[in-house]
């Protein structure tokens, strides 16, 4: 057994861990060990580097933990996919590259919780900007010199993108030119974490590329964290496995758990921190009975509303193997063409009821009919809307199955457990149909493929959701910030009741944000990095942002085509 000592040990080189490793080692007298269970970020592997190849990493286990849920009781008892990234970059290495920060009111709502007063949107915005370099330049809402490359969709990529945005506006919803700017609500272009050369902008590329040459950072891949070590109530180190070899590293200052919403509570529980009764079931010595570890688990669930496309403008030909070498060659040589986009270049956020204070439904538009993981491709020209609710009241949990770090935990999201879930998904399907029947899509829209035009009643829509809805791959909130009985960490990520231990990743969100989670996770890590370093927080940015204040969710009077009567 080998033993080394560092100031900080970071468990997990994902979206948050890479931020911390980079920022902490900016101080040359600080030493950091970064442990990652997966392998390196192979820059010549098109599966992770080509934006259009985003489905490939989910189809194997090289880059994907490939978790599976327990049978979900409200989803026909399906065991559902729960992919998480494995390798330098974590889930930013395998995600869909959609750069969505969330709604300003997400963070203002966090700040109403005891102890989280400094997590308002205006407190968080400087850290979003610090992390970002946007290709069209900085402004009041966007950064111009950060590690993460953000590309904004440009007109003319595919006529279906503009048609779908126009259709949303024709249906009476707002248009917005920036889903991460003044107004998230509405339809418009999507920002994406893609470099100017058409490569995936993971946190391994953006952050670790600048930090890995520093002598005070050691990165160890294929290193699976087994347990956090404690000296009384103080975290003192980590034991980890590299194949059959066990090693121990000691932390002079802190252990930073950045393993994500599934693996972070799993590691804490395996180390004796979690619900005491759960730990005793596995004969794990209890360091601290902390009941919230693994509880409050949240995710976004989504479904695909799919249509036949009457004109040959979809990506259907790109799915054919004989067209892919040309696409790959253009991407490899020039960083351009179909391979250089994730093809989520338009989307939006809407409220389905006037009394919703901020958007409760998200759209990703895609100019092909296919599942996110590349399965179930429709054999024709088609297009689809990925649509799902944003703040489900349902709550799940992550529970340790065994003391073996190689065993996956028991995961239950408890999807669709509340009446509000069903109402929102029915509303979402019906709203999507109203959008799709607008004139902007007349020349493209063929028959509805899924759920199908005959699926109309509440009972029929519910059956479709139970059978076909899938994860949006946004697990979060399982080690939440706060000061209530189920909170795990404080506003700086410090684990309650223990010293020298923090959790910094999407698991500490108290409530899931409105949209994709990579950008908020990076922001959280940037913000807490300043706390760890003892730096003065970045000054609040005093900019306006849209608040509905009870305004109608949809201007039906201005809709080009009025709602169908059923």
Curated annotation (Swiss-Prot):
GO terms for biological process: glycine betaine biosynthetic process from choline. It comes from the Bacteria. It catalyses: choline + A = betaine aldehyde + AH2; betaine aldehyde + NAD(+) + H2O = glycine betaine + NADH + 2 H(+). The keyword Flavoprotein applies. GO terms for cellular component: membrane. Keywords: FAD, Flavoprotein, NAD, Oxidoreductase. Its cofactor is FAD. The gene is betA. Its EC number is 1.1.99.1, 1.2.1.8. Involved in the biosynthesis of the osmoprotectant glycine betaine. Catalyzes the oxidation of choline to betaine aldehyde and betaine aldehyde to glycine betaine at the same rate. Residues 180-202 are annotated as: Disordered. The active site is at residue 474. It comes from Burkholderia cenocepacia (strain HI2424). This is Oxygen-dependent choline dehydrogenase. InterPro entries: BetA, FAD/NAD-bd_sf, GMC_OxRdtase, GMC_OxRdtase_N, GMC_OxRtase_C. Belongs to the GMC oxidoreductase family. HAMAP family: Choline_dehydrogen. Pathway: Amine and polyamine biosynthesis; betaine biosynthesis via choline pathway; betaine aldehyde from choline (cytochrome c reductase route): step 1/1. FAD binds at residues 7-36. One of its GO terms (molecular function) is flavin adenine dinucleotide binding.
């Amino acid at each position: 057994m080998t033993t080394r000592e560092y100031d900080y040990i970071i468990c997990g080189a994902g979206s948050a861990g890479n931020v911390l490793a980079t920022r902490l080692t900016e101080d040359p007298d600080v030493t950091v060990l970064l442990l990652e269970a997966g392998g390196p970020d192979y820059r010549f592997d098109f599966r992770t580097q080509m934006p259009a190849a985003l489905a490939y990493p989910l189809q194997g286990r090289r880059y994907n933990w490939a978790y599976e849920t327990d049978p979900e009781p409200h989803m026909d008892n399906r065991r559902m996919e729960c992919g998480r990234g494995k390798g330098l970059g974590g889930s930013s290495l395998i995600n869909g590259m959609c750069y969505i920060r969330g709604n300003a009111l997400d963070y203002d709502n966090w700040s109403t919780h005891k102890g989280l007063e400094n997590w308002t949107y205006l407190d968080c915005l400087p850290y979003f900007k610090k992390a970002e370099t946007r290709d069209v330049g900085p402004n009041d809402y966007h950064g111009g010199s950060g590690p993460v490359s953000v590309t904004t969709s440009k007109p003319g990529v595919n006529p279906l993108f503009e048609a779908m945005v126009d259709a949303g506006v024709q249906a009476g919803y707002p248009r917005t030119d920036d889903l991460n700017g003044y107004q998230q609500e509405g339809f418009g272009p999507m920002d994406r974490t893609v470099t100017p050369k058409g490569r995936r902008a993971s946190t391994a590329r953006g952050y670790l590329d600048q930090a890995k040459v520093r002598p005070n950072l050691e990165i160890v891949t294929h290193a699976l964290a087994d347990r956090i070590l404690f000296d009384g109530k103080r975290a003192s180190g980590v034991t980890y496995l590299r194949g059959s070899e066990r090693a121990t590293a000691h932390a002079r200052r802190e252990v930073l758990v950045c393993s994500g919403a599934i693996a972070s509570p799993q590691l804490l529980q395996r180390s004796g921190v979690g619900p005491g009764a759960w730990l005793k079931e596995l004969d794990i010595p209890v360091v601290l009975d902390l009941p919230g570890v693994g509880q409050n688990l949240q995710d976004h669930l989504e479904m695909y509303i799919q249509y036949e496309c009457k004109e040959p403008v979809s990506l259907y030909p790109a799915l054919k193997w004989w067209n892919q070498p040309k696409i790959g060659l253009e991407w490899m040589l020039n960083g351009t063409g179909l391979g250089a986009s994730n093809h989520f270049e338009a989307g939006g956020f809407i409220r389905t009821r006037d009394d919703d204070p901020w958007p409760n439904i998200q759209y990703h538009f895609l100019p092909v009919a296919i599942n996110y993981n590349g399965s179930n491709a429709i054999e024709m020209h088609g297009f689809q809307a990925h649509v799902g609710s944003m703040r489900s009241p349902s709550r799940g949990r992550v529970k340790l199955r065994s003391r073996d770090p190689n065993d996956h935990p028991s995961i239950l999201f408890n999807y669709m457990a509340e009446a509000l879930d069903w109402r929102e998904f029915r509303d979402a399907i019906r709203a999507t149909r109203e959008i799709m029947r607008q004139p902007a899509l007349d020349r493209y829209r063929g028959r509805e493929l899924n759920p199908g035009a005959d699926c109309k009643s509440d009972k029929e829509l519910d059956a479709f959701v139970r059978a076909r809805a899938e994860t949006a791959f946004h697990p979060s909130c399982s080690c939440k910030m706060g000061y209530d009985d189920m909170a795990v960490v404080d506003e700086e990520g410090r684990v309650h009741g223990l010293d020298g231990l923090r959790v910094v990743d999407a698991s500490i969100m108290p409530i899931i944000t409105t949209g994709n989670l990579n950008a908020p996770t990076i922001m959280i890590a940037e913000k807490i990095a300043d706390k760890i370093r003892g730096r003065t927080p970045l000054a609040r940015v005093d900019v306006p942002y849209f608040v509905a204040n009870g305004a109608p969710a949809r201007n039906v009077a201005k809709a080009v085509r009025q709602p169908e009567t059923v």
